[in-house]
Amino acid sequence: MIKLSVLKNQQIDLYLNSTIGDWVANHIKWNLGMVYRHGNRSESAYQDKFHNFGKYAAISVHWPSIFSQSKIDEYRFFLNVHSGLLPESRGMYPVFWNVFEHTPAGATVHQITSKLDYGPILFREEVAYSEFESCRSVWSKVFELEKRLFIATANLLSNFPDSLPMKKPVGNIGLNRKATEFHHLKSNYDRLNLSKKEYVRLKLALDF
């Protein structure tokens, strides 16, 4: 986790995995000049060196664990940058499922709640991709969008608003995809009864 030391005796905590951790640290260092880092970015246990600060907000990006309600309740705002359009693309590996099922791809910033990937939405934006584009290609577009939305979120929080312009999720609530579903398809696609079109789409989705 990375801590941002900020004004008004507040703090913004960042829960990041290694995919985005270095980029975020470097970006904030060069653009905001206030990053403080401790612990290994790929580990979940950190020593809190800023325990005297108030708990204002946190941003999560690709964090591998589900946050407990007690952890969520520590912050006024606890926002997650999700690599899918919510509430449709919930759960693990949304870009994979977007490519396999040829559904809209994008990224969402939302408040973390007890219902996974279904909190009020701050930002939600789609990326365009073609029918025969690989998961690798679509993911690169989504990742660039996530970076942009992360910066927009951090900038918004840096002003310490008492409220954020969040909207209730609308549309179909998607399945909460599990990692086991992905690994089952990846390991058994040659033994599944897939149509030719499904097989082609799965090969594209597995190209990452």
Language model segments and positions:
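One-carbon transfer enzymes
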Residues: 1-208
